[in-house]
Curated annotation (Swiss-Prot):
InterPro entries: UPF0060. Keywords: Cell membrane, Membrane, Transmembrane, Transmembrane helix. The chain crosses the membrane at residues 6-26, 31-51, 60-80, 86-106. Belongs to the UPF0060 family. This is UPF0060 membrane protein BH2744.
Length: 108
């Protein structure tokens, strides 16, 4: 459980961070090297996800989607300075509950 959570967090940081760097380059006129670093981070995200121990690609990526939503809310708040509202938090927590059910519910 700790390894799965760690990998989801690392993948999220790589994906959101990479996307943010590309956003800064294309939308905010920042230097092209930020876009290149962003592309590398996005590629790294794809690699990190393969280290998950769960056997199903679909389950891993669907569960990661819930983690991504929660991390994106935090990123927007801490890095981009946009405070989430109550509904953002409720939605993000619902997603995390879904992740827990998908990954750790008892299966035959």
């Amino acid at each position: 459980m700790v390894m799965a959570t760690t990998l989801f967090l690392l993948a999220g940081l790589a994906e959101i961070g990479g996307g943010y760097l590309i956003w800064l380059w294309l939308r905010d006129g920042k230097p092209v090297y930020l876009g290149l670093f962003g592309a590398v981070a996005l590629a790294l995200y794809g690699v990190i996800a393969t280290f998950q121990a769960f056997p199903s690609f679909g389950r891993v990526y669907a569960a990661y989607g819930g983690v991504f939503i929660f991390l994106a809310v935090l990123w927007g708040w801490w890095i981009d300075g946009k405070a989430p509202d109550t509904y953002d938090w409720i939605g993000a927590v619902i997603c995390l509950v879904g992740v827990g059910i998908m990954l750790w519910a008892p299966r035959p």
